Amino acid sequence: MTEFDNLTWLHGKPQGSGLLKANPEDFVVVEDLGFTPDGEGEHILLRILKNGCNTRFVADVLAKFLKIHAREVSFAGQKDKHAVTEQWLCARVPGKEMPDFSAFQLEGCKVLEYARHKRKLRLGALKGNAFTLVLREISDRRDVETRLQAIRDGGVPNYFGAQRFGIGGSNLQGALRWAQSNAPVRDRNKRSFWLSAARSALFNQIVHQRLKKPDFNQVVDGDALQLAGRGSWFVATSEELPELQRRVDEKELMITASLPGSGEWGTQRAALAFEQDAIAQETVLQSLLLREKVEASRRAMLLYPQQLSWNWWDDVTVELRFWLPAGSFATSVVRELINTMGDYAHIAE
């Protein structure tokens, strides 16, 4: 299995180095739900600004404040403790009056707004995230500038970031140990982390192998293609290849890669054979996903940061702004720009 730091770069390995997250203010994330609260219902959606607090801890403190069980507080995604983040939490409070959230006290945390909502906010139920990042101590401004222009046009690999695999790859190692034993894992969080790490590692490996091909973005017979911004996909046939290629080139369609698991992978013929060969050596992780009945799915091979802009503060410091759809990683953008000093795994999704 190829480690995250050695996965194929779309624009070649960066020439220079830089520092990501010298302080929390260098990594700002704002959740984009993609909808507005209903204004009524048994749930309360809260938009919270936090710095120095992890999401689960804030959710637990909020549950105590509302005098409800911790399981009644949900969120769409984990956000980094060591960053400035705006995210939405959801509390189920049936039959209760609207609390006075001005009395909610937690250092580094502030309730910005709140409203009633009819439905629980579930994991992954957001449109995307807006990022403002500051990269410091950049050793090669010219190379970074060239790469930013290339990313604006050509995107980046849609890799799962190193943080998906845990500090030192602990989640992936946990998955491997679990796969090689028959012992049940009763901790639901561990199960989730380990299975996600296993499937994400296999996806990364498939993309890594495809990007080695000079014609990686050429549609082949049996490719699973996805309408940009949509979750469903369809299979390319040889008769349609010229027209489908035109739509891929215009970024109307995206070539996808497998999130392996049980059931059909989605590709057929030549494309399926390529994906199977790309992870043929990873039998242990594949067996785990089959054993635990994790359903196979698809994910776009490339990621195109939206609203990408940048501003050089000086020759060694640049501020980046961009928006990514839910499930995509800012660190996968940064790795195409600089060889980062620091550990990606400390940056939450």
Curated annotation (Swiss-Prot):
Q: What class of enzyme is it?
A: isomerase
Signal peptide segment: none
EC numbers: 5.4.99.27
Which keywords does the record carry?
A: Isomerase, tRNA processing
Q: Which family does it belong to?
A: Belongs to the pseudouridine synthase TruD family.
What does the UniProt record say this protein does? Responsible for synthesis of pseudouridine from uracil-13 in transfer RNAs.
Q: What is this protein called?
A: tRNA pseudouridine synthase D
Please name the source species.
Salmonella typhi
